[in-house]
Amino acid sequence: MSHQHTLPVTVPAVVQGPLKTVCSPDHIQQEQAKQPTPHPTQCQVFTEIQEKGFPKHEEKRPNPVKDLPDQKCEHQQQPGPQKQQLQVKKSQQELQEQELHLEKQQLPQEPQGLLCLEQQQQQEPQMQEQHLRQQQQQQQQQQQQQQQQQQQETQEQGLCLGQKQQQQQQDMLVPQELHLRQHQEKLQDPELHLGQQQKTPEEQKLIPGEKQQELHLGQRHQEPQEQELHLGQKQKQKLHEPELQLGKQQHQKPSEPELPLGKQQQESPEPELPLGKQQQQESPEPELQLGKQQQSHEPDMAGDQKEKQKLHKPELYLRKQQYQESPDPELSLGKQQHQECQEPELQLEEKQHQKPPEPELHLGKQQESHEPDMAEDLEEKQKLGEPELHLGKQQQQQIEREGYQGPKSLGQSLKQEKASREQQLDYSHLEQEKELSDQPLDQALVKKGKQLERKKHELENRTQQEK
């Protein structure tokens, strides 16, 4: 390109020189055809064209054309001027063709550069959008994964908590069930024990070791009976002393004074019975009052009282059976002896027996009217006094028989007296053992009564203070 523009400038100096130079573009074209120049980028070509500019070439072109007519005028004398002009024209035409060719090449390159720029500008936001979309998709995927992990963790935690709660509930239920079973077994134990006690009263009657069982049962009785027992012992001793004296007198004296002595013996137990009844009347009254106070002031003790009553019921039942069964043989003996005795003796004895029970009946009526709950205790204690009367009757009958038989039957009477005394001693021993066995329960009840009285006093003091 640069050679093509500079060659026409050297033409005015020598005519032949420019001719040679004019011919040179053919060689240049051939060389360019052989060695194709590397096409610059579209953007570079566009900038070079702007920098160089086409009007400069156009300005330089007319200069050789203007100079050529002058040269022709000056060198008309030289041979072959026409040929030279033709060559110049040809060279000019070639130059114009080359310029046109270059312009044609440059014109399509300019829009290509613009297209590249436009494409790049269009592609950049698309690439950015794609990149943003990819980032958003990645973020969404990460969030979904995190949510799934959180859900799994929460589910695992919920399962763990549910398992722990179930284990805790099972751990709590197992000891509770064991405790309930133990409590039920404990409740069943006394029931079984009571059932065994109720089943074995008949067996205990046949077994000679009644004393041990009675002691075991008697450990739950009440203290107020101690005084009654002491009084009963004293009364028994008093009864035995006149009986012994009577026996001695009977051996020494005839049978005539035996009747008034028998009457005295029958009359002697009369004051004993009212004393026992008075004690019975006096002793249970505070117990009943204490029970009422416990129900009024201490409702919590109701369950304990019920349990104790349940425990005492079989014992009372056993004792009733024992007392009811013990006097049966004595009664049968007494009936036989009374039938054998003479009629006047029976009349006297009936009169004597009819007189003392009258105040006893009045007392019994009063007790039933004022204290209906204590009827069972009174019956039991009256039964205790009955064997003593039967023994007195037996002694009187024996003495009367001996008096009628005379001195021949003294040996038999002595034997009978010894046997009766032994029976009385055995009976007294049994009663003493029963009384001793009843003492510990009596003490416990007395203590409870004292505690209740203290609580009453405290409550009364509080009520007074509040008033």
UniProtKB/Swiss-Prot annotation:
PTM (free text): Substrate of transglutaminase. Specific glutamines or lysines are cross-linked to keratins, desmoplakin and to inter involucrin molecules.
Region (Disordered): 48-467
PROSITE patterns, per the entry: INVOLUCRIN
Family designation: Belongs to the involucrin family.
GO cellular component: cornified envelope; cytoplasm
Stretches of the chain forming a coiled coil according to its record: none
Biased composition (Low complexity): 76-95, 105-177, 278-290
Pfam families: Involucrin2, Involucrin_N
InterPro entries: Involucrin2, Involucrin_CS, Involucrin_N
Biased composition (Basic and acidic residues): 49-75, 178-192, 220-231, 295-318, 348-373, 380-391, 415-437, 450-467
One example of a Gene Ontology biological process annotation: keratinization
Subunit details: Directly or indirectly cross-linked to cornifelin (CNFN).
Expressed in which tissues: Keratinocytes of epidermis and other stratified squamous epithelia.
Cell location: Cytoplasm
Record carries keyword rRNA processing: no
Principal subcellular localization: cytoplasm
Protein keywords: Cytoplasm, Keratinization, Repeat
Name of the protein in question: Involucrin
Protein task: Part of the insoluble cornified cell envelope (CE) of stratified squamous epithelia.
